[in-house]
Swiss-Prot record:
Its main location: membrane. The chain crosses the membrane at residues 4-24, 376-396. Residues 709-720 have a biased composition (Low complexity). This is Leucine-rich repeat-containing protein 66. Residues 319-368, 463-504, 679-746, 764-816, 855-880 are annotated as: Disordered. PROSITE patterns: LRR (PS51450). The gene is LRRC66. It comes from Homo sapiens (Human). It comes from the Eukaryota. One of its GO terms (cellular component) is membrane. The keyword Phosphoprotein applies.
Length: 880
């Protein structure tokens, strides 16, 4: 309820005041009530009466009307007769007038004083009534003057920002008060044509700029108040001082900067101006001393400047006009002439007082202090803006950058599946991985003379004096069945010791399952990369289309100085070329024959000294082979005794039947040799023809130590060995017995290991096949027989063997043949019959790289065709 009562009371009071403010007129008798006072037609005071309009029935003879403090907002037009108004003083101060025009007072032609102070006036218009009105037409002459008697206009304490426009229309205006407003600057035409203006009050404004020609036409100007403003520059005021030498000016409370212009104009300004400037500059200098702490000397009146003659300043002339009141005269010329005088006086600025120079220095120091602050502010703003922009860009562009990165990663991911493969080094290995049959891989590798080994391990050789371990074909079976022992039929003459030795070799190979792969790969590569040093017979024979009769073997076991151990392999024994086992058998034949001949020739002459020489030769061979960087698998085996080697040689290499057609050991030679594989068919037993007594292996060695041969045998021992070998053919067995007795003392390892070594082969038929189209021929899968034709000068027998099983494309050996070349097919297997090797070792040479060239063993046969016989004879001559 209380809130309701309060609301009702508020509404009633508001309506009451609203009715008072909106009341437009009063009755005619209100003029004479006690609210307004008048003094016999002289003064009418209606201030603080609360009236909102000018009284309409005031006395026409009243000279002054005071309607101040009546909350006037708009001055309305009077309803009285225009002819009756005699008002001279109108006070409208302390009201709420915000905008005013002087048109309502146009009928007050006698008005002299208009007070509009203490209002909210921010705009003042001096436009009068339109000339179309009847009253203006009747009083045209008086209206033209537009307040002809208005002398005082008071506009102080309002909200003016500029000087009122159109003041020149007030022709009789003598005093103008614009103090306590918000005026910023004075325009050069604001007081133009105000010829009667004497007093101008502009104090307490915000004026910071006054042009020198602003008061140019104010000839009667006597007093000007510019105190409490924002004026700084002295030069415009000096020009005004030159134009109005007797002008009373109040310049206090401004931010004057006293410069050299004060000293320049000391002798040209009036005494009053000089005193004022001295006071102003001393005050400003004192304030600077108090603020800066730097003592400054005051400008004294006795400060003398260089004499300046007035005749040089033609621009300064005396004004002819004199004021009647004081009889004072001022010499003022035009603004342009005074500017020239000022520019001429600036040339004397070098000899300025110390105070003036110090003031300039203070200003420069202030500017220098402000410069770092501005720089710091600029840097801070730039850093902030940069951070803001970078943050915005990062926030908006991050999703797009992530998407682009994901797309880039996805585009690169398929490329990871493309595994790198070095075709130059691993083309054969990749081919072996893709082909299911290793034999087919060998067929692909051999015709192209691949320089690298496949995944099938080879025989690994290690140099060792007087020791040769060559497991027979039962090694393949021992890999499959480690516990099984070798049958007597398979072991030949040494059935008892073969099983133990094979088990020892197998156990060693089990400890090194991949040693053969690594060791033989490096050995085969080193052997192939040094084809030129090993001898030129391989490529020369292909280029000249000559039959091959000898093969150089880069394994040191051929010379009797290394162990030959087959590497462990996960493939079946038929994956490798069986002919290579025949080659190592032939190489062992040569080694044993060489040892036998050497022991036979030297046993009678040197006796016990033969063994020491042989040991030294073996040690030198071992050092030479180590230096050739051939990585070999070191397998410590007992050295074979000379007696076992001689017994194996005297046995004429008995022929043993196959125990298992698939049980073939890995080849000792890498697939670099240009030799084919000859397999005896299963449906045909090997036939041994007559073997002459002169088919023993012959030895021929080059013992020139200057050429760096493998064995540094003396020429005497070499010739003796060769001669003894040739003479000892009839009584071969007796010499073997003698040499066996001489070498039995040098055996330091297991003697039974040699008994396991059985040199077996199927005498193959060597056949030279020529391609009419001069292209490599691959053996047909359905061919069941392979023949080998060889002729030796002393051999006329022919041995022909057939494979116990037909050759298939999967396990068929190499059948590539070159025109003009012999392709020798060798095969070693366990045969049930005893066969003899007919070896021709006439050209056993030792190369400079410790590789022994040897002639592959082959059973000699007499060709049935005379042409073939002649051809074989020529080949044997070449081999010799």
């Amino acid at each position: 309820m209380k809130n309701l009562y309060f609301r009702v009371i508020t509404i009633v009071i508001g309506l009451y005041f609203t009715g008072i403010m909106t009341n437009a007129s009063r009755k005619s008798n209100i003029l004479f009530n006690s609210e307004c006072q008048w003094n016999e037609y002289i003064l009418t005071n209606c201030s603080f009466t609360g009236k909102c309009d000018i009284p309409v029935d005031i006395s026409q003879t009243a000279a002054t009307v005071d309607v101040s403090f009546n909350f006037f907002r708009v001055l309305l037009q009077s309803h009285t007769k225009k002819e009756e108004w005699k008002i001279k003083h109108l006070d409208l101060s302390n009201n709420l007038i915000s905008k005013i025009t002087l048109s309502p007072f146009a009928y007050l032609h006698a008005l002299e004083v208009l007070n509009l102070s203490n209002n909210a006036i921010h705009s003042l218009s001096l436009d009068l009534l339109s000339p179309k009105s009847s009253w203006v037409k009747r009083h045209r002459s008086s209206f033209r003057n537009r307040f002809p008697l208005l002398k005082v206009l008071i506009l102080q304490r309002n909200k003016l920002s500029d000087t009122p426009k159109g003041l020149w229309k007030l022709k009789s205006l003598q005093s103008l008060d614009l103090s306590f407003n918000g005026i910023l600057q004075i325009g050069w035409s604001d007081f133009h044509n105000c010829l009667q203006l004497e007093n101008l009050c502009l104090k307490s404004n915000k004026i910071f700029k006054i042009p020198p020609q602003a008061f140019k036409d104010l000839k009667k100007l006597q007093v000007i108040d510019l105190s409490n403003n924002a004026l700084i520059t002295i030069l415009p005021m000096m020009i005004i001082a030159l134009e109005f030498p007797h002008l009373v000016v109040d310049l206090a409370d401004n931010n004057w900067q006293c410069d050299d212009s004060v000293a320049v104009f000391q002798n040209f300004i009036s005494e009053s101006w000089r005193k004022k400037w001295n006071v102003i500059c001393n005050r400003s200098i004192g304030s600077e001393e108090a603020n800066g702490g730097t003592p400054q000397s005051r400008i004294s009146r006795e400060t003398r400047l260089p004499p300046i003659h007035l005749h040089r300043m033609k621009s300064l002339i005396r004004s002819k006009a004199e004021r009647p009141q004081g009889g004072r005269h001022t010499g003022i010329s035009t603004l342009g002439k005074k500017a020239k005088a000022g520019s001429g006086l600036r040339k004397k600025q070098r000899r300025l007082p110390r105070s003036v120079r110090s003031t300039r220095d203070v200003q420069a120091a202030g500017k220098k202090e402000d410069a770092p602050q501005d720089l710091a502010l600029a840097v801070c703003l730039s850093v902030f803006i940069t951070f803001l922009v970078a943050f915005s860009l990062g926030a908006f562009t991050r999703p797009y950058v992530d998407r682009l990165w994901q797309k880039k990663c996805q585009s690169k991911s398929p490329g990871l599946d493309n595994a790198y493969s070095n075709e130059g080094f691993y083309d054969d290995m990749e081919a072996a991985g893709h082909t299911p049959h290793p034999e087919t891989h060998l067929r692909q590798v051999f015709p192209h003379l691949s320089l690298y080994e496949n995944q099938t391990p080879f025989w690994v050789t290690q140099p060792h004096p007087h020791a040769t371990v060559i497991p027979d074909r039962t090694l393949g079976r021992s890999r499959k069945d480690p516990g099984s022992s070798q049958s007597p039929g398979q072991c030949g003459d040494n059935t008892g010791a073969g099983s133990g030795n094979d088990g020892a070799v197998y156990s060693i190979l089990q400890r090194h399952p991949h040693a053969g792969n690594r060791e033989l790969m490096s050995a085969a590569q080193d052997h192939i990369h040094r084809n030129d040093i090993l001898g030129e017979w391989t490529y020369e024979t292909v280029a000249q289309e000559e039959p091959l009769s000898a093969h150089s073997v880069g394994v040191s076991s051929v010379a009797g100085t290394s162990h030959a151990v087959s590497g462990s392999s996960r493939y079946d024994s038929n994956e490798l070329d069986p002919s290579l086992s025949g080659e190592i058998t032939a190489s062992l034949c040569k080694m044993l024959t060489h040892a036998e001949a050497q022991r036979t020739g030297d046993s009678k002459e040197r006796g016990g000294t033969e063994q020491s020489l042989w040991d030294s030769q073996m040690e030198f061979s071992k050092e030479r082979q180590v230096s050739s960087s051939i990585d070999l698998l070191s397998i410590q085996q007992p050295r074979l005794s000379g007696a076992r080697a001689e017994e194996a040689l005297s046995a004429h290499y008995s022929e043993v039947p196959y125990g298992d057609p698939r049980d073939t050991g890995p080849s000792v030679f890498p697939p670099r040799w240009d030799s084919g594989l000859d397999v005896t068919p299963a449906n045909k037993e090997p036939v041994q023809k007559s073997t002459p007594s002169d088919t023993c292996c012959e030895l021929e060695s080059d013992c020139d130590s200057d050429e760096g041969s493998l064995f540094t045998l003396s020429s005497i021992s070499s010739e003796s060995a060769r001669s003894k070998t040739e003479e000892a053919v009839p009584d071969e067995e007796s010499l073997q017995d003698e040499s066996s007795g001489a070498s039995k003392d040098n055996v330091t390892a297991v003697d039974s290991l040699e008994e396991n070594v059985t040199f077996q082969t199927i005498p193959g038929k060597c056949k030279n096949q020529e391609d009419p189209f001069e292209k490599p021929l691959i053996s047909a899968p359905d061919s069941g027989m392979y023949k080998t034709h060889l002729e030796n000068a002393s051999d006329t027998d022919r041995s022909e063997g057939l494979s116990p099983w037909p050759r298939s494309p999967g396990n068929s050996p190499l059948g590539d043949e070159f025109p003009g070349m012999f392709t020798y097919d060798y095969d070693t297997a366990l045969q049930s019959k005893a066969a003899e090797w007919h070896c021709s070792l006439r050209d056993l040479e030792f190369s400079n790289v410790d590789v022994l060239q040897q002639t592959p063993p082959c059973s000699a046969e007499v060709p049935s065709d005379p042409d073939k016989a002649a051809f074989h004879e020529r080949d044997s001559d070449i081999l010799k």
